[in-house]
A protein has these predicted regions:
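Aromatic-anchored helix/helix-loop segment that forms the rim or "lid"
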Residues: 66-70, 76-79, 117-137
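Active-site-proximal helices and loops of the catalytic beta/alpha 8
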Residues: 1-97, 143, 160-192
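Aromatic/acidic polysaccharide-binding cleft in carbohydrate-active enzymes
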Residues: 37-38, 99-125, 141-180
Length: 198
């Protein structure tokens, strides 16, 4: 209850300062209790986007700590997970949910496409780059840019940056060495997103 009261007070202060401000929370699990219109507006969409997309397209857990053959390419599991978790989001929360493929905590999506379980603490950084699948990355981008929500690109994903989970996922941006084909694909998909919305 204290947590809920804090967020109600927080929302009141924020909305008084700027009624248009968006209160977006990082949350794992069902956020429904905080999305009743008096606390958060939306969430970083792990459960209804990042995790199901990752399992479906790569079979990997988002930290690259586990590979699950039973979830790789399993359309029933993907659809069921998406439907189940999307139910906990009101329409306005769904359309503002932060749909990420990668972020500052998890392995890069492009690295997950190589289906290699590992972390940089016991594997070389080069292992995160070996055998990545750009076709799968493009499939993920297409889903990200056409799915309901706010597609959020973690810096470097558009340029082909790889990396296992934190801290390897925080590599520097490859200025002048970007993957031009991937960058071009991102631009095309962003244009489609802007034109038709999600």
């Amino acid at each position: 209850e204290f947590n809920h009261q804090f967020w109600k007070d927080f929302r009141k202060a924020v909305k008084e300062a700027n009624p248009e401000a968006l209160i977006l929370a990082e949350h794992y699990g069902n956020p429904e209790g905080w999305l009743q219109g008096d606390e958060w507006d939306s969430v970083m969409n792990y459960d209804a986007f990042m995790e199901p997309v990752t399992w479906f397209l790569t079979g990997m857990e988002k930290h690259s700590d586990e590979y699950r053959e039973d979830l790789y390419g399993n359309s029933d599991a993907f659809i069921n997970a998406m439907k189940n978790h999307m139910r906990s989001l009101h329409m306005s929360a769904l359309h503002t949910a932060m749909n990420e493929l990668s972020n500052h905590d998890h392995s890069r999506f492009l690295t997950r496409t190589n289906r290699t379980v590992g972390r940089v603490s016991y594997m070389s950084p080069e292992a995160a780059e070996r055998n990545v699948d750009y076709a799968v990355m493009r499939e993920a981008i297409a889903i990200q840019m056409t799915w309901p929500g706010a597609p959020t690109v973690y810096y470097g994903d558009e340029a082909g940056v790889c990396g296992f989970t934190d801290p390897d996922n925080r590599r520097t941006y490859p200025w002048g060495r970007e993957n031009k084909e991937l960058l071009s694909f991102y631009k095309k998909m962003i244009a489609i997103h802007k034109k038709v919305g999600s």
